[in-house]
């Protein structure tokens, strides 16, 4: 595993601020806030991603709604304990923020324009789950453990499609892989034991390319390249 943790986990987002910043936590006198960023898709829809940011990155501690910004950082996870239950919370941890020069222009969207890209280098935590949708599309669910400084790890859910999904069936638990994709938000319904239904939002990486990291096996690298597929 690459011990340069910035290379293990890097994300670039360009979008529009859609919420007021909310206080999250404080560490050694440094306050952190959360806000929501809307990133447009080619389809015309948008992904709404939570961003965690230090007060030290905000000019005059201001972050107006509708501001258009770019964010460089990492896609991270942490556990939220509610009674006896545990939930995996995902957020983008901002390391750099830039206000777009022309705030009046719409955020451009195109295949050659990077507005949502994440690169992760991690380990397969459990056997990928391969399945087909009712429409016959191949999907594989992957849980990736990405090492971070101070002996921490981020557990990132990923979705592979098509040939990448089929290929994941053969990837063993513990394999080190590198994925490139985008972070997406997805609404779903959680049914509780008492029959009530709660609407939730899941955050995950939609994988556009995937490769096994094995410097000693050229055969693996060739096989993975054959399985690279655009979103």
Question: Which stretches of residues belong to each language-model region?
Answer:
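Single-stranded nucleic acid-binding surfaces, predominantly the OB-fold ssDNA-binding core
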Residues: 1-231
């Amino acid at each position: 595993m690459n011990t340069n943790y910035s290379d293990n986990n890097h994300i670039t987002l360009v979008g529009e601020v859609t919420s007021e910043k909310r206080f999250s936590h404080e560490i050694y006198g440094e306050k952190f806030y959360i806000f929501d960023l809307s990133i447009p898709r080619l389809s015309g829809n948008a992904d709404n991603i939570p961003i965690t940011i230090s007060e030290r990155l905000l000019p005059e501690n201001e972050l107006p709604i509708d501001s258009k910004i770019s964010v460089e950082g990492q896609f991270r996870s942490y556990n939220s304990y509610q009674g006896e239950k545990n939930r995996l919370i995902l957020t983008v941890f901002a390391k750099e923020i830039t206000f777009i020069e022309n705030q009046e222009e719409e955020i451009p969207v195109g295949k050659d324009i990077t507005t949502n890209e994440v690169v992760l280098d991690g380990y397969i935590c459990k056997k990928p789950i391969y399945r087909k949708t009712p429409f016959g599309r191949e999907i594989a669910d992957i849980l990736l453990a990405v090492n971070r400084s101070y002996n921490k790890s981020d557990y990132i859910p990923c979705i592979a499609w098509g040939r990448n999904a089929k290929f994941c069936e053969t990837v063993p638990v513990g394999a080190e892989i590198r994925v490139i994709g985008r972070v997406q938000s997805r609404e779903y319904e959680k049914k509780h034991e008492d029959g009530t239904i709660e609407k939730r939002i899941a955050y995950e990486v939609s994988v556009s390319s995937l490769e096994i990291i094995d410097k000693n096996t050229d055969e693996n690298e060739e096989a993975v390249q054959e399985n690279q597929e655009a979103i």
